[in-house]
Amino acid sequence: MQIGQRLGTPLSPSATRVMLLGAGELGKEVIIALQRLGVEVIAVDRYPNAPGHQVAHRAHVIDMTDPDALRALVDAERPHLVVPEIEAIATDALAAIEAAGVCEVIPTARATQLTMNREGIRRLAAEELGLPTSPYAFAQSFDEFAAAVARIGFPCVVKPVMSSSGKGQSVLRSEADIEPAWRYAMAGGRVNHGRVIVEGFIRFDYEITQLTVRAIDPASGQTRTSFCAPIGHLQVAGDYVESWQPQPMSAKALERSRDIAHRVTSALGGRGIFGVELFVRGDDVWFSEVSPRPHDTGLVTLASQRQSEFELHARAILGLPVEPALATPAASAVIYGGLDEAGIAFEGVRDALAVPGADLRLFGKPESFAKRRMGVALATGANVDEARERAKRAAAAVRPVSAR
């Protein structure tokens, strides 16, 4: 495959083939962006009829943590690029695939290995790169966990080293929280082993996601780093419920945020978009986490930027030029399922879209849970405050209902 020079025709011998590992709502938007560039897309997930399955050329259901199943599928499909969109993947198999020259892993196999759990990326950021982070400790057993909490002190945060969307994450404020927090962390991890990170609580003014793009500069042919405007977000129990762009911040804090983002993404390497999560207080900035893929808080870019984070990712991985500029202030607000049922319906869509500047993305997930993210409302405005009010009003208008 000639990166940045040639794209083929889907379903033909000339096709440029991309396999996405993970076909949720973020993967779905990446697939749509790739489809618009004439790319043949293979979507893979652990359950049938995932959102990305519905828009891909081909769909597969496998256990992506099974290295043999993953390698067999890659050998059968022969993609030019493999693009992980979730963390729960057999990353050692990806490393072997990359080393054998079977295909390119985005951004790199090493990056997927380091970011698949919080331990790898925290040690890279704090111990190798010397980036400012919260105090932290890792624990493998309940006794180690209790000792780590005693060492870090209250309040503190516990997270499974392998989890996403706030699963298994809680804040400990006293000794009475220790045992329940351990049980919750064990239930929320993606794999069956009890390793957690305990983090000291940082008293921050706000959190941001600094979307960072590593793409080929057409003038030099070299990889260049560029940045989207900072995204502010509100999280509840570790899960994003609202985001907006741009987040107002001081020039010094923005400079420090981008320096941290540049350093950590350069260490990970490769091409694509990275979601770098940071805590900010005044001019001070602390590194939190990084995802080597589009970020859920970045759904706001579907309204705020001419090229969304998904289009930026698609272009960057294909070696094409990117333009991450902000077009307008915008916001997003999550629409939850509200009930536990397969094949739900949505009422109030007309009212939601009647809100000035509003738009919707209903993800098409086949099964709803009360707190499962089933869609998102987007809105533009003259400023962030107006956009946030509109997005929340549009989201509140949508009513998930039983289809029975």
Curated annotation (Swiss-Prot):
A Pfam family that the UniProt record links to this protein: ATP-grasp
Record bears the keyword Cell inner membrane: no
One of the protein's GO biological processes: 'de novo' IMP biosynthetic process
Residues bound to N(1)-(5-phospho-beta-D-ribosyl)glycinamide: E25, L26, E85, D296, K365, R372, R373
Keywords: ATP-binding, Ligase, Magnesium, Metal-binding, Nucleotide-binding, Purine biosynthesis
Source organism superkingdom: Bacteria
The keyword NADP is assigned to this record: no
Root EC class: ligase
EC number: 6.3.1.21
Domain ATP-grasp: 123-318
Cellular component, GO, one term: cytosol
Catalysis performed (reactions): N(1)-(5-phospho-beta-D-ribosyl)glycinamide + formate + ATP = N(2)-formyl-N(1)-(5-phospho-beta-D-ribosyl)glycinamide + ADP + phosphate + H(+)
Binding positions (Mg(2+)): E277, E289
Pathway: Purine metabolism; IMP biosynthesis via de novo pathway; N(2)-formyl-N(1)-(5-phospho-D-ribosyl)glycinamide from N(1)-(5-phospho-D-ribosyl)glycinamide (formate route): step 1/1
Positions bound to ATP: R118, K159, S164, S165, G166, K167, G168, Q169, E199, G200, F201, I202, E207
Molecular function (Gene Ontology), one example: phosphoribosylglycinamide formyltransferase activity
Quaternary structure and interacting proteins, as annotated: Homodimer.
NCBIfam families listed in its UniProt record: PRK09288.1, purT
Similarity comment: Belongs to the PurK/PurT family.
Function: Involved in the de novo purine biosynthesis. Catalyzes the transfer of formate to 5-phospho-ribosyl-glycinamide (GAR), producing 5-phospho-ribosyl-N-formylglycinamide (FGAR). Formate is provided by PurU via hydrolysis of 10-formyl-tetrahydrofolate.
Protein name per the record: Formate-dependent phosphoribosylglycinamide formyltransferase
